[in-house]
C-alpha cells in the first residue's frame, strides 16, 4: 500500500542567476592600470526533474514546494571565472506529468525511469572587462551583469504506471485479490472504502518476468463527478493495458451484478472514452459464497444480458487464481517484455550526467524602441522593454558601461526623440536609476 498517498501538487522552481563579470586590472610594469583581467561570472544553476522507480507518491512536495538553484559566482581578477551554480535535481515517481501552471501546457510525461526535463534554466554569467578590451578601448571599465535564471510555477500530476488495473464497486474483493496474487500488503475489511488510496502489487509470472497491478479504490455511480472517492483515482487506470473488472457474484451486499457492471462502465466512459477501449477481463469473485447451481444461473444471466464472458474465481480460497494470472499475462506479455528490456537499459545509464544545459542568455538588441515619459515640467524618463534589458546587463554607474548604453540609445535616435518629447536644455532625464542634465 502507498502510505501517505499524494498524486497532485504545485511547486515553484527558481533557477540561479548568472554571476556578474569582474572589472579588474593586472599589475604590469609600463602598462596603464596593468591591463584588464576581469573574469567572467559563472552560469546559474538549473533545475531538473527526473523520474525514478524509488518513489511512488508525490508526498515529499507537501512539505517542500519551492526549489532554488545556486547563483553563479561573480568573476574574479587574474581572468578567473566564477564557479557555476549547482544544479538541483528533483526526483519524482515514474508516471509523473509536468504541467506549466500558468498555461496548463503539458511539458513532459515521464513514463519511464531515468527520463528528465530541465524545467528552469540558469542564467548566463556576465563577461568580465577582459572581454571588452579593443585597440581603442584598452582600459575598459565595463563588465556584464549575469542573466536572471528562469522562474516557473509547475503542477505535478502522478498517474500510476501499472500494467493491470483492478476496478469495481467497493467491497467486491479487489484488496483480497491483489494480496492473493502479488506481494502487496493491504488492509482488508468487510466494509466499503476500506481502500482509500491505490494499492500496488507486483505479480511474478516466472523468474524473469512480472507485471504491476493497481487496486483502484472502489468506484460508485457519480464517481466522475466527485462522488464517493470521486474521480481523483480514475486517472490512475489511464495507463493500464488491461482492466480486470471485479463483480461480486455472491449478491450478498448488492442485488444485481449486471447493473453494477453497467454502472461502472458508464463511469469510465464519463471520465474518458479511452478507458472503454482498453482490454477488459470481467471476473466474478466470491464464488465460494454461493452454491454451484446458483453460480451457474448467475453466470449465465450475466452472459445473456451483457453478451460478455465472465471468469469465476474466489480471491478468498484461491480458486482459479493462477488461471486468471495466466489469462492476464497472455494479453500483456509482448508489450511488457519489451518494456522491461527498455527499462533495464535505461537503468544501466545515468542520463543526468550527460545533460548539457544551455543557460538563459540575453544579447541586447541593437534596435531599441524608445519612449519618453514626462514626470513633471522639467523631468523626463526614458523607458522601454529594450532599455530595461540593456540596463539588466550593464551597470550604468560604470563610466564605460554608461557610454555603451548611451551610444546604443543614440544610435536609435535618443536625442531626436527627447527633443520631440519637449525636453529642453537643463531638464533632468532619467534612464533607470541614473539621471543626467540634458544638453542638446
Swiss-Prot record:
One annotated GO molecular function: GTP binding
EC number: 3.6.5.-
Residues covered by the Obg domain: 3-161
One GO biological process term: ribosome biogenesis
List of residues binding Mg(2+): 175, 195
Main location (coarse class): cytoplasm
Keyword Transport: no
Required cofactor(s): Mg(2+)
Keyword tags: Cytoplasm, GTP-binding, Hydrolase, Magnesium, Metal-binding, Nucleotide-binding
Residues at which GTP binds: 168-175, 193-197, 215-218, 285-288, 314-316
Alphabetical list of Pfam families matching this protein: DUF1967 (PF09269), GTP1_OBG (PF01018), MMR_HSR1 (PF01926)
A GO cellular component entry from the record: cytoplasm
Record's keyword annotation contains Magnesium: yes
Domain OCT as annotated: residue spans: 359-440
Location within or outside the cell: Cytoplasm
OBG-type G domain sequence ranges: 162-333
Free-text function comment from the UniProt entry: An essential GTPase which binds GTP, GDP and possibly (p)ppGpp with moderate affinity, with high nucleotide exchange rates and a fairly low GTP hydrolysis rate. Plays a role in control of the cell cycle, stress response, ribosome biogenesis and in those bacteria that undergo differentiation, in morphogenesis control.
HAMAP family for this protein: GTPase_Obg (MF_01454)
Subunit (UniProt): Monomer.
Family that this chain belongs to: Belongs to the TRAFAC class OBG-HflX-like GTPase superfamily. OBG GTPase family.
Protein name: GTPase Obg
Gene this chain is encoded by: obg
